[in-house]
Amino acid sequence: MTNKKRHIAILLGDPSGIGPELVSKLLSQNELDQANIIVIGEKNILENGNKITGNSHNLNFVEKFEEINFEKGNKFFLDISKGKNINYKLSECSAESGETVLNALNYALDLTKSNKIHAINFAPYNKTSMKLAGRDRKSVV
C-alpha cells in the first residue's frame, strides 16, 4: 500500500434493511476524506439507499480490488454482484439478503487477512436472513 491513508472497507449491511440508507448518509460525510474508502457490495443496493436519502456520490466503480487506484480518488465501490440484479424487498428477511451480506463480509475479511485493507465498518445485518442463508449465530462475526 503506497498511499499513507488507511484503507477502510464499508459494507452495505442487509439489503432489505436500513443499512444501505445509513451507508448513503455516511458517504456524504467530509470526514471520510481522511481515509481511502472501499464500499463493498452490490451496486443496486447502494442505489436503493441513495434513492431513499436523495444522495448521490462520486465513487469510482470497480469489480476487482486490483482495479483500485487511489491516485484517482479515495472513494471506490467494489461491485461484487457478478451481474446479478436481485430486487430485495425492504423489511423482509430472505436467504438472498443473508447470502449477499455473507458474500460481502467474506470478501472484506479476505482483503483484511491479505493486508489490503486496514479496517471493516459494516451497516446493520439481519441475523435471521443470515441464518436463512445457512449461517447460525455462532458462526457470524
Residue ranges and their predicted role:
Residues 140-141:
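Conserved small/polar residues in nucleotide/adenosyl-binding loops
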